[in-house]
Regions:
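ASCE P-loop NTPase motor core, strongest for the SF2 helicase catalytic module
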Residues: 1-106, 126-151, 157-163, 167-477
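A short helix-loop-helix "switch/interaction" segment in the helical subdomain of ASCE P-loop NTPases
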Residues: 112-120, 150-156
Length: 477
């Protein structure tokens, strides 16, 4: 119906879903300008949407993106393949000239020659793309925006979590993963299952202890002896830390655990929080185990993939406009992009995305135009586990993005090439210290798993919770 009125208008605004489904209509026209908002959606050149968009005929092309590089520099090639086809060569040529040297220099075992080659490739890429990239950060355009403070909140695993973690290091699954990582034909399915398993162990034992778990009888005996239940929050270092963090923020404080005067003050100065999880099952734990049982005074609402798209705006509006709602529970996938949640001034990440841009986008749901308070961001990290590796990978990817696309991006001098070799070199001091501190309680297999992965899982793999039943069988020693 709208297509029939096309010639009466000078501007067409369309969602990416419409472009994909009605591609014939958009490809049949010759446009003067084609502007992609959140243009990093075409970072994967092999998707149908990317192929359709790159076939659109237009005199001028422009991409708007807060995160043009999320995982690797090959994504930048895909964006330029839309803007200026051929400017960075073919995908194969780009990989050979830029992608491969940069990836090799990232390897912890890379030689000084490989590190230097990676730095030179990065510098060359920066020089070539510099004239076509304009970067503006919030601090440049929103000088009245309150600051955003990011803090890492470390928590220790419970005794049961430590047992499950150590059992994994002695299991057949660990041997299978080690073989997969070191073999020429890596079986990424096993790696993802192992990572998913360990991530759930870091969250709460009940997420992995099912009837098919080989240690289920020993775990039940342990729980019986401790006179607790499997779902108890004391078996999760993260839930205990989350409870304390919320209480420190004045959320969930009642007269029973505070004086009347302090309780009144906590209500007056109370913060409101966004709590992000990767997995819906962990959101369930926070809601059903922490809030309903241990913090019943907390008022909350929830936004995840089970909420119809048409109902999400109403939930956002209700949270922003009703200060009596303490917490909004969200999955990073659903709530991490495009929403305005300035009703909150506290953001808590219970889990973390491999892609640092996803977490940055999520925390900026609160830190945006309209926010009047300082935004405090807390990242719960299970000490001595693969989560510390995840945060290390996040830092590396942010350094890559910030080196290619600098803060100013107005001249070649804006890129400090003297620090590039440090970016790709192993920080031996910190690495050794970390290794000594964590080797006693961190399975060596985790390091092998993560260093052996060439590509980190995407949104679809996050959305699909792997069936771990078959994987459980390989946990037997």
């Amino acid at each position: 119906r709208l297509q029939a009125n096309f010639h009466h208008h000078n501007l067409v605004v369309a969602s990416y879903d419409i472009i994909r489904t009605d591609s014939d209509f958009f490809l049949a026209k010759h446009w003067n300008y084609c502007i992609l908002d959140e243009g990093h959606i075409i970072k994967n050149s092999k998707t149908k949407l990317s192929r359709v968009i790159k076939e659109i005929r237009a005199n001028h092309r422009l991409i708007l993106s807060g995160t043009p590089i999320q995982n690797n520099v090959l994504e930048l090639w895909s964006l330029f393949d839309f803007l200026m086809p051929g400017f960075l060569g073919t995908e194969r040529e780009f990989t050979s000239k830029f992608g491969k040297p940069i990836l090799q220099s990232r390897d912890a075992k890379s030689s000084s020659k490989e590190q230097e080659a990676g730095a030179l490739a990065m510098e060359a890429l920066h020089k070539q793309t510099l004239p076509f990239l304009l970067r503006r950060v919030k601090e440049d355009v929103l000088q009245d925006l309150p600051p955003k403070i990011i803090q890492d909140y470390y928590c220790d695993l419970s005794a049961l979590q430590v047992k499950l973690y150590e059992d994994f290091s002695r299991s057949q699954a660990k041997k299978n993963i080690d073989q997969s990582v070191t073999s020429e034909h890596k079986e990424h399915g096993h790696i993802f299952q192992a990572l998913q398993y360990l991530r759930k162990v870091c969250n709460h034992p009940s997420l992995v202890v099912t009837p098919s778990h080989p240690e289920v009888h020993n775990i039940i005996n342990y729980i019986d002896q401790s006179k607790t239940s499997l779902n108890d929050i004391q078996h999760s270092g993260k839930l205990l830390a989350l409870k304390q963090l919320l209480l420190d923020c004045g959320i969930g404080v009642t007269e029973s655990n505070n004086s009347n005067e302090d309780a009144l003050n906590s209500v007056v100065s109370q913060h409101r929080a966004l709590i992000f999880c990767q997995l819906k099952s962990m959101l369930d734990m926070v809601e059903n185990t922490l809030f309903k049982i241990n913090m019943p005074s907390v008022t909350y609402t929830r936004l995840d993939g089970s909420v119809p798209a048409g109902s999400r705006h109403n939930i956002v509006q209700r949270f922003n406009n009703d200060p009596s709602i303490d917490v909004l529970l969200l999955t990073t996938h659903v709530g991490g992009l495009g929403l305005n949640l300035t009703g909150a001034d506290t953001v808590i990440f219970v889990e973390h995305d491999w892609n640092p841009m996803k977490d940055l986008q999520a925390m900026d749901r609160a830190h945006r135009i309209g926010q009047k308070k300082v935004v405090n961001v807390y990242r719960l990290i299970a000490r001595g586990t693969l989560e510390e590796k995840i945060m290390g990978l996040q830092k590396f990817k942010l350094n890559i993005a910030n080196t290619v696309i600098t803060r100013d991006n107005s001249s070649l001098q804006s890129m400090d090439t003297s620090q590039l070799l440090d970016l790709f070199a192993v920080d031996s001091g910190k690495e050794d210290k970390s290794k000594k501190a964590s080797d006693s309680n961190k399975p060596q297999s985790v390091k092998n798993i993560l260093e052996g992965m060439e590509e980190l899982w995407d949104t679809d793999q996050y959305a699909t919770e792997y069936d771990l039943d078959n994987f459980m069988g390989s946990l037997k020693q």
